[in-house]
Amino acid sequence: MNEKVILFTAGLAFIITVVLSPIFIPFLRRLKFGQSIREEGPKSHQKKSGTPTMGGLMILLSLSITTWLMSDIFFERTAHTYMLLFVTVGYGLLGFIDDFIKVVMKRNLGLTSKQKLAGQLLIALIFYFFFQHYSMSTVVSIPGTDVSLDLGVAYVLLIIFMLVGGSNAVNLTDGLDGLLAGTAAIAFGAYAVLAWNQGQYDVAIFSVAVVGAVLGFLVFNAHPAKVFMGDTGSLALGGAIVTIAILTKLEILLVIIGGVFVIETLSVIIQVISFKTTGKRVFRMSPLHHHYELIGWSEWRVVVTFWAVGLLFAILGIYIEVWV
């Protein structure tokens, strides 16, 4: 398999998303699947109220079609392909239910935290079942070192922690026009390079299919956004990148490649702990991207800055894995 296949895969996913979007967005608008904006959020966001959401369905459809076609044409589908699609679509479905409850049933909070956690745990456990069935490695290595540890049965705890925590971290990043789409494209691109370097072409194909799909979505999601991906897209992307990290045995490296997601999550944790213990907030608002908006940065400036930071993290991750 050569580089042309990778480029063709990304291009196909991009085109499918770009073609679907002008059809899908008006359909979402007619169904009145509009995003509700939190009153406590930045005032500049109130004008976004009613913007169609659940656009993550386009990403899911595009990456699924592309992965299925490309794996059918260029190599026999592997267990990795099925596991990646299962977790991604599973978390996407969970996000869709959450979006549907919020948008259609007009319950602002969507699924309760317990319901969402139960869904995330169920998908994680089913994934672990397949992981065990195919006797995959439970060894975890520290990037850039020769240090490794076989977790054995305890690896299931790592899978649960990564899938639940990772999907929520990616979800938190989806707060500004184009922010998650851009940072996700960069992170998945980094893992595509590393999967290709390992000879895991099935994982590389899936990764670049995601890159193409989210870049196609970014055409319509960049400021001012014509559509939001919703939890349908953000939870799916979170589940997908964690699964890729597990299958490539680069679990810990996700902390670096997904550095933006980690920072966003830490900002929320710090804010909550600080307010509960001292009654004071460290940031104007969390996640961190809203803090920068409230100190005067334009939305576009925040997004581009976070993209740049995400790119630096991705380059650092590739460097550590390939050259250190």
UniProtKB/Swiss-Prot annotation:
Membrane topology, as annotated:
Multi-pass membrane protein
Q: What class of enzyme is it?
A: transferase
Q: In which pathway does it act?
A: Cell wall biogenesis; peptidoglycan biosynthesis
Q: Where are the transmembrane segments?
A: 5-25, 55-75, 81-101, 122-142, 147-167, 176-196, 203-223, 227-247, 250-270, 302-322
> Any idea which UniProt keywords this protein has?
Cell cycle, Cell division, Cell membrane, Cell shape, Cell wall biogenesis/degradation, Magnesium, Membrane, Metal-binding, Peptidoglycan synthesis, Transferase, Transmembrane, Transmembrane helix
- State its Enzyme Commission number(s): 2.7.8.13
Citing just one GO molecular function, the answer is: UDP-N-acetylmuramoyl-L-alanyl-D-glutamyl-meso-2,6-diaminopimelyl-D-alanyl-D-alanine:undecaprenyl-phosphate transferase activity
Q: In which broad location class does this protein mainly occur, judging by the first location in its UniProt entry?
A: membrane
Give the signal peptide as a residue range, or say none if absent.
none
**An example Gene Ontology CC term for this record:** plasma membrane
Q: Which reaction does it catalyse?
A: UDP-N-acetyl-alpha-D-muramoyl-L-alanyl-gamma-D-glutamyl-meso-2,6-diaminopimeloyl-D-alanyl-D-alanine + di-trans,octa-cis-undecaprenyl phosphate = di-trans,octa-cis-undecaprenyl diphospho-N-acetyl-alpha-D-muramoyl-L-alanyl-D-glutamyl-meso-2,6-diaminopimeloyl-D-alanyl-D-alanine + UMP
Identify the InterPro entries for this entry. Glycosyl_transferase_4, PNAcMuramoyl-5peptid_Trfase, PNAcMuramoyl-5peptid_Trfase_CS
What GO biological process terms are annotated to this protein in UniProt? cell division; cell wall organization; peptidoglycan biosynthetic process; regulation of cell shape
What's the cofactor?
Answer: Mg(2+)
Q: Name one Pfam family in it.
A: MraY_sig1
Give the UniProt subcellular location, in the record's own words. Cell membrane
- What's the domain of life for this entry? Bacteria
Per its database record, what is this protein's job? Answer: Catalyzes the initial step of the lipid cycle reactions in the biosynthesis of the cell wall peptidoglycan: transfers peptidoglycan precursor phospho-MurNAc-pentapeptide from UDP-MurNAc-pentapeptide onto the lipid carrier undecaprenyl phosphate, yielding undecaprenyl-pyrophosphoryl-MurNAc-pentapeptide, known as lipid I.
Entries under HAMAP family matching the protein: MraY
State the family it belongs to: Belongs to the glycosyltransferase 4 family. MraY subfamily.
Q: What is this protein identified as?
A: Phospho-N-acetylmuramoyl-pentapeptide-transferase
Give the organism the record lists: Anoxybacillus flavithermus (strain DSM 21510 / WK1)
Q: Which classification does the entry list for the species?
A: Bacteria, Bacillati, Bacillota, Bacilli, Bacillales
